[in-house]
């Protein structure tokens, strides 16, 4: 079975799985959260986050390879660090998926209502639109997980085409005075203090760790293909993010982000700022298509993951009745939160970053340290000895401190 998987899938497939998982609607939060730090410091902290998340992923892979193919994250966590940490990990995974579902309901409501308003002249209520999109996605998941996967794949293909058209155009229109913030009233001020408030969102932008067990099922224990998938998949995401920052911060002045942030920082506000740069009709159309598809594909991906996680957690069967129960568990809590607090996209992504710090940063580092003691002759060990796990844990603690510093208004905020 493993040999057939190795022949069937090249490392390119794994690279696309990793990159496709992390690149989505969450990328709209990056320029908003990094507006204070602006391009050069923003790029710097994004690279730091990529380095740390790449190595936490490799540490998770290191621990995973000591167990039979198909072993779940729960199995490995329980065996190496005990049931208490396994429960903590399970709670954080569920919270991350729930908060991301809420964030994408919010983003869908905002961007689709804005698209309707711009093209049809009808001002749709974002809350109603958000709930309607949630009902649509819930209906698809109730019918079939395969249908949701196929729709996500279709959206991904269209998203790539529209991305190339739109940002190929914006790339050649970058104004270096805007990129350097030379014309701003705040030009010359320090950008460095603003990097800390963006750390949780930068971390959440590289959350591919849930795919590692799936990659091992696909490739078996061919560590060369697994390592290439993780390294080049996350590196591709980093390059696209840097390109995205270059295009956004080279076209939209830093001062304009204050209005975006004050309006809640949702996807529609950023898109309207892009449209204010006076683009041709085809570029405007492709920008709207890309924005809608980026959010929609992430929404399908996250809710599919949450649906499967809850079905496994509560041992709910795959009948229509069972799937209906799982759909209710998946969508009701975030939908109710959305009705109470509709403009929570940025806060949702940041909150996901906090919880992802535990299960995707700190726990993988601890698992690798424990695995090295339990399996001294393991087949793969991340370079750097115990220094790399220590750096990863330090990064995780820093992100947690920054998140709380942001919540309690200790850190400086832009806007």
Curated annotation (Swiss-Prot):
GO cellular component: plasma membrane
Side of membrane Cytoplasmic, spans: 1-11, 55-86, 149-153, 213-229, 308-326, 370-387
Keywords: Amino-acid transport, Cell inner membrane, Cell membrane, Membrane, Transmembrane, Transmembrane helix, Transport, Tryptophan catabolism
Segments in the Periplasmic topological domain: 33, 108-127, 175-191, 251-286, 348, 409-415
Induction data: By tryptophan. Is subject to catabolic repression.
GO biological process: amino acid transmembrane transport; L-tryptophan catabolic process
Membrane-protein topology: Multi-pass membrane protein
Entry function: Involved in tryptophan transport across the cytoplasmic membrane. Plays a role in transporting tryptophan which is to be used catabolically.
PANTHER family to which the protein is assigned, alphabetical: LOW AFFINITY TRYPTOPHAN PERMEASE-RELATED
Family statement: Belongs to the amino acid/polyamine transporter 2 family. Mtr/TnaB/TyrP permease subfamily.
Protein name according to UniProt: Low affinity tryptophan permease
Native organism: Escherichia coli (strain K12)
Classification of source organism: Bacteria, Pseudomonadati, Pseudomonadota, Gammaproteobacteria, Enterobacterales
Chain's gene name: tnaB
């Amino acid at each position: 079975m493993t040999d057939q998987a190795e022949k069937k899938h090249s490392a390119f497939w794994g690279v696309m799985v990793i990159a496709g998982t992390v690149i989505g609607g969450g990328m709209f939060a990056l320029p908003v959260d990094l507006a204070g730090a602006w391009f050069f410091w923003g790029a710097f902290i994004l690279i730091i986050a990529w380095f740390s998340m790449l190595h936490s992923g490799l540490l998770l892979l290191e621990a995973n390879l000591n167990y039979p193919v198909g072993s779940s994250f729960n199995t490995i966590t329980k065996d190496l660090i005990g049931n208490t940490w396994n429960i903590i990990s399970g709670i954080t995974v569920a919270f991350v998926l729930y908060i991301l579902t809420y964030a994408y309901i919010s983003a869908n409501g905002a961007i689709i209502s804005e698209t309707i308003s711009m093209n049809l002249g009808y001002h749709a209520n974002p809350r109603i639109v958000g709930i309607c999109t949630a009902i649509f996605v819930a209906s698809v998941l109730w019918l079939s997980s395969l249908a949701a996967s196929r729709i996500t794949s279709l959206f991904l293909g269209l998203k790539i085409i529209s991305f190339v058209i739109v940002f190929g155009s914006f790339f050649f229109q970058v104004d270096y005075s805007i990129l350097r913030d030379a014309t701003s009233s705040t030009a010359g001020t320090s950008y460095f203090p603003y990097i800390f408030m963006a750390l949780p969102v930068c971390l959440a932008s590289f959350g591919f760790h849930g795919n590692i067990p799936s990659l091992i099922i696909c490739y078996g224990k061919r560590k060369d293909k697994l390592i290439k998938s993780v390294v080049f998949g996350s590196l591709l995401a980093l390059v696209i993010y840097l390109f995205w920052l270059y295009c956004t911060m080279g076209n939209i002045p830093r001062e304009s982000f204050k209005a975006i942030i004050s309006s809640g920082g949702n996807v529609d506000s950023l898109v309207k700022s892009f449209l204010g740069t006076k683009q041709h009709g085809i570029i405007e159309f492709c920008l709207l298509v890309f924005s809608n598809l980026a959010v929609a594909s992430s929404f399908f991906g996250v809710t599919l993951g949450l649906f499967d996680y809850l079905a496994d957690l509560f041992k709910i069967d795959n009948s229509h009745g069972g799937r209906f129960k799982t759909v209710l568990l998946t969508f009701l809590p975030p939908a109710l939160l959305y009705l109470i607090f509709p403009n929570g996209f940025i806060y949702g992504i940041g909150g996901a970053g906090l919880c992802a710090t535990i299960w995707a940063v700190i726990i993988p580092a601890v698992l690798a340290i424990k695995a090295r003691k339990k399996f001294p002759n393991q087949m793969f060990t991340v370079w750097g000895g115990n220094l790399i796990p220590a750096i990863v844990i330090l990064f995780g603690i820093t992100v947690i401190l920054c998140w709380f510093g942001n919540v309690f208004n200790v850190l400086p905020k832009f806007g």
